[in-house]
Every structure is written in C-alpha cells, then in structure tokens.
Regions:
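Bacterial N-terminal signal peptides
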Residues: 8-19
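Extracellular ligand-binding/catalytic regions of CAZymes and related secreted enzymes
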Residues: 22-81, 89-106, 110-112, 118, ...
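Edge beta-strands of extracellular beta-sandwich domains
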Residues: 128-137
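Soluble catalytic regions of membrane-associated enzymes that act on cell-envelope
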Residues: 518-639
Length: 735
C-alpha cells in the first residue's frame, strides 16, 4: 500500500505537460517612441512638379516633449543601383518644448537619373537616428503655376489644363503629338503667423514658370523669402500680382517691381475684348498671326465679319510688341469676360507698365511682373472661363520665355558630360603640354647621352666601367629636370580658377550668376567649399579629383557649404554655384529706331570682346567699351547676320545656338579668334542645347567684364584667375 502514493505522483507528473502550462515569458519592452515627429514634402506640395533641377523640401518638426529637442535633419537623394554617389544636404533643428518648427532642406534631381529615392532622416544632438521619412517627388518638366492664396480655389479649374506650348527643355520628353498639362502648386502656410512658407533661395523656384500672389501677401514678405522671390523674377521668372488694397500699390517693393508707383485706371477696352480661350483637348491652340508694332491702334474686318483691334502680347524685353489681333465682336455675341467679372475689373498704369494681353506688365531684369485686372482666386473670376483661359495663357507665356535664358534659376545640366569643357578650362593639367614637351626633349637627350656618347667615351678612354659610373649621374639629372619642370608647370601649392556667366536685363543691376569654381591641390587635402553668399547653392560638378565621392551640403544661417570633401593631389575638383549678383552699374541697350541700337556701359569696368546682336540685322564685334562709353551697333565689325544664325529645336520651337565658331569669325585676327573661342566654348558646352542665345525679338550683348573684383583666396587656395562673362538681354536703361 505504501507504493500507491508514489505511483499516483508519477502518473500526475506524466500528464502534467498536457494539463498545466508554465507562465508565458514576459513580452519585450516596447520600443521607446521618438521624442519628435517629422513630416516632409516638397515646399509646394508632394504632387507639384519640381522639374529637373533644384527644389526645396519643407520639413515640419513637432516636439510634444516638455524639453527642447535639437539635432540634425539629413536629406539624401540616391539611386538604388548607385548608392555611392548620393546627394546629401543637412540642416540643424532646435524646437522648443511643445512647439513646431519648419526647416528647409535643399535638394536637386540627379543628372541622367531622374528624381531618385528621397529620404529625410532626423538625428538627435548625439547623432543617433530617430526617424527615416520617405519623400515623394514629382520631377516632371511642366509649366508650373504656384498660387499663393489660402485656400487656392483656382486649382480645381486649372490643374491639368492642356498647355499650348512649343518649348521643351528635353525635346522628346512628352512623346509624339502629346501635350503636357499645366502643373499646379501651392505653398503651405504657417499656422502661427498665417504667412506662406516660400523658398528662401531663388533656386527653390527652379521648377516654377509663374507665381500668382495677392499684393497684401507680397507686402508682408521680408528677409530671405522676399529676396529669393525678387531674385527669381530678375532671373527670368513671371510674377502675377492681384492688387487687393490701394495702399499695396504704394508699397516700395510693389513700386520697384512696376518701375514706379502704379495706380488704377478703367479696364482697357481691348482687354475686355479678348476672346475666351476654351480648355484645349490636348492638341494645342492656333496662335493668330503677328502684326508689327507700327500697326498699333488700327482696326479691320475679318473674313467672318468679326471686327478686330490690336493689343501687345508682352513688353518683349522692355520694348512694346509684337501685337496680336484681338476679336472685339462676333456674330452671336461677345466672347469676353462675364458681366459679373467685368464689374469688378480694373486696369493699372504707371512706372514701366505696358498694357498687354495678360494685364499691365513691366519688365524686371529678365523676368516680368503682371498686374492682373481680375481676381482669379474668388468668385466671380474663379468661375469665369475667360479668366481661367487668361491665367493658363499667362503660364504658357512664362514657360516659353525660359528658352531665352542660358542658365535658368535652379537649373542643372541634363547630362554630366556637358561640363567636361568647363572642367578642362579650369584644370591646370590642361596647360601641362609645354611641360610634356620639355620632358620629351630631356628624355631624348638622356637616351643619347647615356647611350652612344657615354659608351664612345668609354671606348676612347679604355675604361669599361665608365658607363656604370656616369649612367646614374645622367639618370638623376634627367629625373631632377623633369620633376622641376613638372613642379614649375603644376605649381608648388594648390590654387583656384573661376569662370562665371552673369545674365541680366538691360538697364538693371541685379542678375543671375552661374559660377564654376575649380580647385587644384598639390596634396591630399580636406576641403570645405562655402557659397559666395547666403543666397547661393552649391554642387560638385566632377568628382575626378575627390578621394571619396560622398559630400554633403550643410545649410545654416550663414548660407550653404560643401563639406566632407577630400581632394586628390594634382587633380581638379569643380564646383557649380548658382546665385544672384548686384553689379555696381547697369548696361543700357537703347533702341535708336529701325535696326539701330546703342550700348552704354555704366558698370564701372571695361567691357572686353563685346558682341552686340541686333534682332533682324546682325551681330557686331567691338574690342572694348570703356566705363561710361557708348557704341552704336552699326559701327562694329559684323560677325554674322540674323539669317546665318545656327538653328536648332527645343520641342517644336526653333532656337538659335551660341555656336562659338561664328563668334570666332574669320573677319577677326587669329589672336582674337582663339581668345573668343577659348572664352565661350566652355559656356556653350555647359548650357543645354535648348537655349535660344539669339532671340528673334530681343537684342543680346555678350562681353567679358575686365578687371572685375574677385577674392584673393577661395576655400584657402589662391585664386589664380577669375573670368566674369556677361549676357545682357532686351532693351532698357538710360544714357
């Protein structure tokens, strides 16, 4: 009987696993949530096309903690198959407890690689990664309108409107027979102040054709946001203003953009007679025939019984015309705006404003400022098909004007090979040919001396060991001569070379500038390349002279800088910089009637190797124009005529290439031809083939600014040369 309890215990233990489960292991502690939250998107919205250049990514950092949070935001653009050469930009953040902060990060598309994968990482002040947020980006090249209204009601009517355009920066981008739609974008607004969150560098507008803004918002802008917008307009952008209050017209910024204080007038009858532009089906709109400015004011009867009058389409780079026949009446009723829209319309004049088919328009630098006679942001204008068509036409016109600019703000080359000529012009190694020739001569002499001559002496003296004694001497002498020649040509220390192109409107002092900065070092060296000013952006053009392909763009209050660059000895690193520049004076281009043009130099410097192109006539060469000097185009040496310009295509639009072979015309002496070709060939190669260097409707002045001020050092290296070139477009200025 004593064994029964033991057997019972054994039986219980045997079945225990099926009737009893041990307590489950405690779950691992949940990961600690990050102390901040991050949201990132392109500054004009995640659906807005940013084009194939620079753009801003707006990052909102929310801090729900009871203590301030600070660290670094890092944006990375890379391709899955080529993660060794990403684009990286960084900016610090510091968010007080319970607050929200907005941080702008710079980005650009990858040459020959599209948008790539864009991510924003947040790190704390110790470098630990907190968050990794993907950023959707649309890099389509489209005519984009940014509507700075809150909310934007025009987007419903205009988004995807088939654009009737001819110009394309990439001729095959839209296929055969297809038509791109107008891209629509709108900025975010600061929840605390109600102000729009706009780019603080003009490169942030790289993918934008036109900006629509009420004047009460413009008058509130200040600091970097205002400077970026104005610089973008001066560089070729189009700003459409909706006057909201009488006092806005007296604002200094508004007056400066209009060339003087504007004031309201009755709506021009010709504007009211403009026909309604129906929404295209995708095949485009037929443009009426162009009539010369001399015919302004005439009226005539069309074949269909419609009566017409003439209205200029645009200021045409500071000059009125060409003019467009406008239908004023047609059997079946008016084609103008609705009566409710007309009742609220007003015209404007004053300053340099000219009445055009888009509104009262002034030229500002290379860009345009349009004072709209209607308000497209609210009823009745926003619901009027006539208003919708006018705005669409304005965006299309703004897009077409981009063809006249060699380096539009925020643009980057479509192909990396385009900068090869620029790299060669900035590379001291390209000047090593004399050194190579000297080395070849030294080696030839060495081979003769150490060979036949030394052995002949040995035979004459009967000393068979003489070559063994003298050969090392001749070898050391030849080696030393070659090394000294190499050091003499390449230099004992590093140095920098620079080349810039300033594009500017006639009569204006602010223009857009594209700088190429070459850095040549004699040793492995860590470089930090800072921007010339806080409004410029930087990027590495060629990495042949870099030990590591990775570099990052650091953004702070003082501007941007490329860091983490380690250069290789005797190699050249080239950096591209985009910004704006204010010249000490302007270059005036004055219409003297017919095909006559006078050019007046107010820059304070001598203009060297000047080319003055007169539309419909020819390009004329002048060796120099002194400060304060005036030349008449007809008195120069003819390089080529308008009929002999080299033509190309950009989409379905005809453009005219720079073609340095025509600048280096046989009518010039050989030294001048070589200098002109060496100066302008790198610029021609760096610009896309879609540039209309010699427009049909605007004069162009090309020149080198002789004696331009430049820094003595660049990123710690001596500046060996700094060439500043000018391209002046349009009419304007004073004697």
């Amino acid at each position: 009987m004593s064994r029964l309890p033991a057997l019972a215990t054994a039986a219980v233990l045997a079945i225990a696993p099926t009737s009893y489960a041990a307590p489950a292991a405690a779950p691992p502690p949940a990961a600690k949530p990050p102390p901040i939250s991050v949201a990132a998107a392109p500054i004009f919205g995640q659906d807005a096309p940013v084009g194939s250049g620079w753009y801003d990514v707006l990052v909102r950092v929310d801090n729900p903690q009871a203590t301030a949070q600070k660290g670094v935001l890092e944006l990375r653009v890379s391709q899955p198959w080529d993660n060794e050469r990403p684009f990286v930009s960084r900016a610090p953040y510091n968010v007080p407890a319970g607050k929200t902060a907005y941080v702008r990060l710079l980005a650009h598309s990858l040459p020959e690689g599209g948008s790539g994968e864009v991510h924003v990482k947040a790190r704390d002040d110790k470098g630990a990664e907190l968050l990794d947020v993907p950023v959707p980006v649309n890099t389509a090249d489209l005519p984009v309108l940014v509507d700075v209204h809150e909310p934007s009601r025009l987007s419903v009517a205009l988004r995807g409107w088939p654009a009737s355009i001819r110009y394309s920066p990439t001729p095959t981008a839209w296929g055969y027979g297809s038509t791109p739609g107008i891209g629509f974008a709108a900025p975010s607004f600061d929840r605390a102040t109600g102000d729009p969150l706009l780019p603080e560098r003009k490169a942030g507008y790289g993918g934008v054709a036109a900006v629509l803004m009420p004047t009460d918002v413009l008058t509130r802008l200040q600091g970097d946001a205002l400077d970026a917008l104005v610089s973008w307009v001066a560089g070729g952008g189009t700003l459409a203003l909706v006057p909201m209050r009488p006092e806005d017209l007296r604002n200094p910024t508004v007056a400066a953009l209009a060339g003087g204080e504007p004031h309201p007038i009755p709506t021009p009858p010709a504007l009211l007679a403009l026909p309604t532009i129906p929404r295209p089906s995708g095949t485009g709109i037929t443009v009426p025939p162009v009539i010369e400015p001399e015919d302004e004011g005439i009226g005539f009867e069309g074949e269909t019984g419609a009566s017409f009058q003439l209205l200029p389409t645009a200021p045409a780079h500071g000059r009125r015309g060409p003019f467009l026949p406008i239908s004023t009446s047609r059997r079946g009723g008016s084609l103008g705006p609705r009566p409710a829209t007309v009742a609220k319309m007003s015209g404007y004049e004053g300053g340099s404003l000219v009445q055009t088919a888009h509104g009262a328009t002034s030229t500002y630098g290379l860009g345009e400022v349009v004072f709209l006679s209607y308000d497209p942001s609210q009823a009745p204008g926003v619901d009027d098909p006539w208003v919708q068509g006018r705005v669409a036409s304005l965006v299309e016109h703004a897009w077409e004007r981009r063809a006249n600019i060699a380096f539009p703000p925020g643009s980057i080359p479509k192909h990396s090979w385009r900068t090869d000529e620029m790299r060669r012009s900035l590379d001291p190694n390209e000047n090593f040919r004399p050194g190579l020739g000297f080395a070849a001569i030294v080696l030839a002499i060495y081979s003769v001396v150490v060979g036949p001559i030394t052995f002949m002496r040995s035979r004459k003296k009967g000393d068979p060991l003489l070559p063994l004694r003298w050969a090392p001497v001749w070898s050391a002498a030849a080696f030393g001569a070659i090394v000294i020649a190499g050091l003499a040509v390449k230099g004992w220390t590093g140095r920098s070379r620079r080349m810039s192109l300033v594009e500017i409107g006639a009569g204006f002092t602010r223009g857009t500038i594209r700088r190429y900065r070459g850095f040549f070092t004699s040793e492995t060296r860590a470089l930090k390349v800072g921007a010339t000013d806080a409004a410029s952006v930087l990027d590495v053009v060629t990495g042949d002279g870099v030990l590591r392909p990775r570099s990052s763009l650091a953004v702070d209050r003082d501007g941007v800088a490329l860091d983490e660059i380690t250069s290789l000895p005797w190699q050249t690193l080239v950096v591209r910089e985009d910004g704006h520049v204010d010249l000490p004076g302007s270059i005036a281009v004055l219409d003297t009637g017919g095909s006559g043009i006078d050019v007046v130099n107010h820059t304070g410097k001598v203009l060297k190797d000047v080319v003055v192109y007169v539309p419909g006539d020819a390009a004329h060469y002048f060796a120099a124009i002194p400060d304060g000097g005036t030349v008449s185009a007809a008195s120069g040496t003819v390089l080529f005529t308008s009929a002999t310009r080299r033509a190309g295509s950009a989409g379905s639009r005809i453009v005219h290439t720079l073609d340095v072979t025509t600048l280096a015309s046989p009518v010039l002496d050989e030294v001048t031809r070589d200098r002109m070709e060496a100066t302008w060939r790198p610029v021609e190669s760096a610009a896309d083939e879609s540039v209309d260097w010699w427009p049909d409707d605007a004069p162009v002045v090309l020149a080198e600014l002789d004696g331009a001020d430049h820094p003595r050092t660049d990123s710690g290296l001596r500046v060996e040369s700094d060439k500043v070139l000018l391209r002046v477009v349009g009419y304007g200025g004073a004697r």
